[in-house]
Structure formats: structure tokens, C-alpha cells
Regions:
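Short, low-complexity disordered leader/linker segments with a strong preference
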Residues: 1-33, 55, 60, 462, ...
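Extracytoplasmic "Venus flytrap"
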Residues: 26-48, 66-69, 144, 434
Length: 491
């Protein structure tokens, strides 16, 4: 009798527990395949926190990571051929035109927006970057824009070098506002022995990503922006008739500036740098300047990666004293002496679910987990994650940054530089139309020719324009123009 009673009790207990187990493991037996870039930046969090989500839900997560140069071809080939091999895509928002515009990803459901606290994401990212044709197809994972890093212990009016600098260049040594000033400071310090964390060693002027098939084209755009972005006019890559602007005198001057600074003031082997190198060289105290997304900031406070803790200054990228007005065919002196046009380069990494995924429910739940407000804050203040500030709460909560190791002054400086970039009325949003990858690949090739001396900047950019026109014609000029205007918010 006791045995029979025990069997009944165990059976009832099993029935009682089974729904709980099923509820706690809602995606048991389901596999979610994620595709993104290799390395600690972006790919690292996708894998680490994907494993946490899998343990909590019973699902299996496979994160496939590819070199950045290979990522777009891998994704677009899988989508266009209908292999169904990827469920979640973590990709450059520049590619939205091909990916969302091609109908390859699912709209973001309201429950996902609610779960990630959608309204906390800055309007730029939730309304423009995540949208295609009036529909939200992605969740912003990272807020990207370019910024300038500099050694504030060396570059300031009270610096030990200030008097010598002013005697040579005629202005007070301080955070540069123009590319001319940036070059003069870099030139002044190039090869000079300076003290960094108690060690005296020669320093380079600049560390920038110049390697072909990496991110060089985005850093050319930083320079071209000041010289060619007309205040109040949204057109930058193409004009209102889809004629490429990238070989006009403003763009040519930007490329010439880059050639000049490479020849005078570059860190050793900078021609082979991508952003990973910049994120090592500047925090190591080996350059006066660095250009990057927001990633360098948290690295500068990491005692395991940085010797410039408290010595790094953060600023909006420089502008130009004059800009080329393509509508009149003339140079214009900038109002106030500087035409600043900060660049929302890349626009950030976004997350979408493939329309042909057969595990949509699990895939969107993974997106919720990876894009949550609390995790976003943790990732933004952690060096090496590739995730930069994109939420209002991250700008409002200074304790988030001081708790991570920033001193209060540096935290404010860092956040102010990012916010000033995003909020600038003359800021440029990156190219997002179909073919963006191809357009940029052609520009990348032109930059390499100019930097190595194979062609002068004008000739190199003329060749780029010829290729851009061919891409536009192949994709359909009228349709490309319509989509380009839509991306700019122009009717």
C-alpha cells in the first residue's frame, strides 16, 4: 500500500513540475544561428550573452563570426539564395537598404520594443537607423558616430609645450577645431619625446584606420565632411540628381589632407591599421591623436590596456575653414570660421531576424535579451565590446560611467562629445541605400591609390565616381535616387 501511495505521489509531483520546466525552458530543442563579425567587439557580447540566454531558455545558440570584410558577402549571399542558414543578423546599419529593402528581415514586433524599452533609445537610432520605408526592421544594438581622442595633458594652453607651439604656429595650443589645426599639432609632436605615465618616449602625431578592406573610407568622410557639407543642405554623397559628389574639390581636399598627414605624422605602419590598432596605440600612449567611434573611451580607463588614464581628451571631429558649395561651384568661408559637420559613421550595429527563419519566436527572444536596457549600459562602459552609447539613460546616469572607472570630468567630456556630434544640425548620416557596400568598396580602393601615391587624389576620386555611376545605373538610377532622398528625409 505504501509503495502504491508513493507511486501516486511521485506521479502527481511529476505532473506538477512538468509545466514549470516547460515554462522555464520555453525554447528547449530550438537552435538559433546568429551571424556577426569576429573579434571581441560585437561578436564577443553576441556569444557571451547568447550563452546566458540559451541556458535560461533551453535553446541552443550558434554564433558564426566572420571578418568584417567578409560579413556583408556572407549575409547577403545567404539571404539572396534563400539558404535559411541564419536566424539573427547583427550587421552594419549601412546595409539596411539591401537587407531590409530586399525584404529579407521581419518587422520588429511591439512586444520586442516594449521589452527593450524602445523610447529610451535615442531618436536618431530608433527612428532613422532602425527604420526602412516607414517600418522598423531592426533593433539598434550600438550607437555609432566618429569622435576625436587627444592627449589633453599635452594639448592644452598650460601645457609645457604651449609657448613653443604658439611661437611656431601663432595660436594657443588647445583642442583643434579645424583639420589644419589638427595637422599642425600632430606635426609639432611627431617624434617628440614626451612623458607618459612616468616613461619618456617618442610619440606619433596620429593613429587612424587606414588599411584597405577595413574602415578607411569612413575616416576620409570625416575630413571630406568639413570641406564639402553645405549647412542646411542634406546632400553629401550624391546631389539631388544622383550625381556623385565624391570628386568635387571639397572631397579632394579632404583626401589630400589625409595623404599629407599620413606622410608627416602617422604612427609606424599606420597604412596597415584598422580600428583595432587605433584602440591599442592611443591608449598605450603612442600617439597624440586618435580617430575612432566611441570605443576608445572605455579602453582609456582600463588599467590592463591603458597608460593614459585621466590623460585622454574627447572631442567632436574637426571641421574646415571653408567648404565647397557644389550648387554654386565656389568655395565659401565658413560662418564663425569653422564648418563642422560631424559624421554619424556607420550608424551603429543593428539586430534583425531573418524573414525565412523557422524559429522566429526564439530568435526575437534572443534579440530582447541582447538588447535590454541594463545590458546595454554594461556593454557601453566596458572596453572592447564594440557597443557605444545609444540610450538617453546612458547620458543621464553619470554614475554608470564613474562606477566603471571614469573620473567625473572625463565622463562628462566623453558623453558631451558624443551628444554634440549626434545633435549637430549639420551632422551627416551614413549612406544606407542598396549598394552601399559596393559604393564604399570602390571608395576604399580609391583611397588606397592616393595614399600609396599610385594616383593623385583628384584622379583617384574621378575613378571612384565612374564606378559609382556604374553601380547606380545597374541598380536603377531613379530608384536609387528615390531611396537616397528617403534616407535623407527629403521628399
Amino acid at each position: 500500500m505504501k509503495k502504491a501511495l508513493l507511486v501516486v505521489v511521485l506521479a502527481l509531483f511529476t505532473l506538477a513540475v512538468m509545466p514549470v520546466v516547460a515554462q522555464d525552458q520555453p525554447f528547449a530543442g530550438k537552435k538559433v544561428v546568429v551571424v556577426t563579425q569576429e573579434g571581441s567587439a560585437i561578436g564577443g557580447p553576441a556569444e557571451k550573452y547568447g550563452a546566458e540566454w540559451a541556458a535560461a531558455t533551453g535553446a541552443t545558440v550558434e554564433v558564426q563570426r566572420f571578418a568584417f570584410a567578409d560579413l556583408y558577402p556572407k549575409i547577403i549571399t545567404a539571404l539572396q539564395t534563400g539558404t535559411g542558414e541564419f536566424d539573427v543578423l547583427i550587421y552594419a546599419s549601412d546595409w539596411m537598404g539591401d537587407i531590409a529593402g530586399g525584404g529579407y528581415v521581419s518587422p520588429i514586433p511591439d512586444d520586442v520594443k516594449e521589452a527593450v524599452e524602445w523610447d529610451d533609445i535615442l531618436p536618431l537610432y530608433r527612428e532613422r537607423i532602425a527604420d526602412w520605408g516607414g517600418t522598423t526592421y531592426a533593433v539598434p544594438f550600438d550607437g555609432d558616430s566618429h569622435m576625436m581622442y587627444y592627449r589633453k595633458d599635452l594639448v592644452n594652453p598650460n601645457s609645457p609645450y604651449a609657448a613653443e607651439f604658439k611661437e611656431k604656429y601663432g595660436w594657443d595650443l588647445d583642442e583643434p577645431q579645424t583639420w589644419t589645426q589638427y595637422k599642425q599639432i600632430a606635426e609639432f609632436f611627431q617624434g617628440r619625446e614626451v612623458d607618459t605615465a612616468g616613461v619618456t618616449a617618442p610619440i606619433s602625431g596620429v593613429a587612424e584606420a587606414l588599411r584597405k578592406k577595413a574602415q578607411s573610407f569612413w575616416f576620409l568622410m570625416d575630413r571630406a565632411a568639413g570641406y564639402s557639407k553645405i549647412p542646411g543642405n542634406p546632400y553629401f554623397f550624391f546631389d539631388e540628381n544622383m550625381k556623385p559628389l565624391v570628386n568635387n574639390p571639397g572631397w579632394v581636399q579632404g583626401l589630400q589632407d589625409w595623404v599629407d598627414i599620413y606622410n608627416c605624422c602617422a604612427a609606424p605602419d599606420m597604412i596597415n591599421f584598422d580600428v583595432v590598432n587605433v584602440r591599442a596605440v592611443f591608449p598605450a600612449g603612442q600617439s597624440v591623436f586618435g580617430l575612432d567611434w566611441g570605443d576608445v573611451g572605455p579602453i582609456t580607463i582600463d588599467p590592463n590596456a591603458s597608460v593614459v588614464q585621466g590623460l585622454a581628451g574627447f572631442g567632436v571631429t574637426p571641421g574646415a575653414e571653408k567648404y565647397w558649395d557644389y550648387t554654386t561651384g565656389a568655395w565659401v568661408d565658413a560662418e564663425g570660421g569653422v564648418n563642422k559637420a560631424p559624421f554619424i559613421a556607420f550608424g551603429g550595429w543593428v539586430i534583425s531576424v531573418a524573414a525565412d527563419s523557422d524559429v522566429q519566436d526564439a530568435a526575437f527572444d534572443y534579440v530582447k535579451y541582447l538588447s535590454g536596457k541594463d545590458l546595454a549600459g554594461t556593454l557601453a562602459v566596458t572596453g572592447g565590446t564594440g557597443v557605444n552609447p545609444l540610450r538617453q539613460s546612458q547620458f543621464d546616469n553619470l554614475d554608470l560611467w564613474t562606477g566603471a572607472g571614469f573620473d567625473e570630468e572625463s565622463a562628462k567630456d566623453y558623453l558631451d562629445a558624443i551628444k554634440a556630434t549626434i545633435d549637430d544640425p549639420n551632422a551627416i548620416v551614413d549612406l544606407r541605400i542598396p549598394g552601399a557596400f559596393e559604393y564604399f568598396d570602390a571608395l576604399d580602393a580609391g583611397i588606397a591609390k592616393a595614399i600609396t601615391g599610385e594616383a593623385d587624389p583628384q584622379t583617384a576620386l574621378d575613378e571612384v565616381v565612374a564606378t559609382w555611376d556604374a553601380i547606380t545605373d545597374r541598380l536603377g538610377r531613379e530608384n536609387q535616387l528615390t531611396l537616397y532622398k528617403q534616407s535623407l528625409g527629403v521628399e
